[in-house]
Amino acid sequence: MPDRRTLLLTVLAMLAFAGNSLLCRAALKDTAIDAVSFTALRLFSGALMLAVLLHLRRRPATPARGGWRGAAALFVYAAAFSYAYVQLDAGTGALLLFGAVQVTLLLAGLLRGERLGGQALLGFLLALGGLLFLLLPGASAPPLGGALLMLLSGLAWGLYTLLGRGGGDPLAVSAGNFLRALAFAALLLLAFHGQLRLDGAGLAYALLSGALASGLGYAVWYSALPGLTAIQGASVQLSVPVLAALCGALLLGEPLAPRLPPATLAVLGGIALILAPRLGRAAREGA
């Protein structure tokens, strides 16, 4: 059982992850900021926050690390995420993102030779079916363009996660990747310089998304991870789409699409089935 400090850090990290969806959707729905400006400001403030946190740590100075492949994946994630939330509600976007990330990680495992048992295969098909159900044509389906962009964002984040495994100090790697991603953001700003829009509220949302929900949120999550098993770390992330949907309804006044609750149950239930055998093995080994 995680200690109280780990539990608190975990709750704060999940709120930060859900907060990214809420801040991005609120900015692009209710303010004048455009998706390109939001992306660039989010990456800039995230890089700044991570650099500050890296500097303040009580250990020998660690330079920012990471690499260009990780930075490219991070940029694609952030840009597609912003463009998707021009059209999607917070809960729908978070579910598509989360589902795409988990499917990407699972497929990567299969390509490495990992095998799925019967229960895990059922879970994979259930989660995939939930995503497809959400995307089926109909009055309550999310806009296809926004949905595809969010799936691309999830794919990119899954690749970013895979590239970061075994890369050393996660905070230093994240700081380096955010810093490098600014080069891609600058190119995007140049390409769309005549279409950029900004106001005070949009600026504030973008800076909060980058500095708090992204930079500080990732740092809090990295601090919580040593106190969690791998299965616990994967399982608690099941809460993010639910938190985003509930907070979107409460704070942004977004209606819950009729397909969202059953799709959420299918996706999260399927992922829980995938994790359950590993959780059982971990519990037996720790007994």
Curated annotation (Swiss-Prot):
Q: Does the keyword Transmembrane helix apply?
A: yes
A GO cellular component annotation here is:
plasma membrane
Q: Which UniProt keywords apply?
A: Cell membrane, Membrane, Repeat, Transmembrane, Transmembrane helix
* The species this protein was found in: Pseudomonas aeruginosa (strain ATCC 15692 / DSM 22644 / CIP 104116 / JCM 14847 / LMG 12228 / 1C / PRS 101 / PAO1)
Q: Which residues cross the membrane?
A: 7-28, 32-54, 67-86, 91-113, 120-139, 144-163, 170-192, 202-224, 231-253, 263-280
Which parts of the sequence belong to the EamA domain? Answer: 15-136, 155-276
Q: What is this protein called?
A: Uncharacterized protein PA1977
Keyword Glycosyltransferase included in the entry's annotation: no
Q: Which cysteines are cross-linked by disulfides?
A: none
Cross-referenced Pfam families, in alphabetical order? Answer: EamA
Q: Which SUPFAM superfamilies match?
A: Multidrug resistance efflux transporter EmrE (SSF103481)
What is the protein's membrane topology class? Answer: Multi-pass membrane protein
Kindly list the places in or outside the cell where this protein is found, as annotated in its UniProt entry: Cell membrane
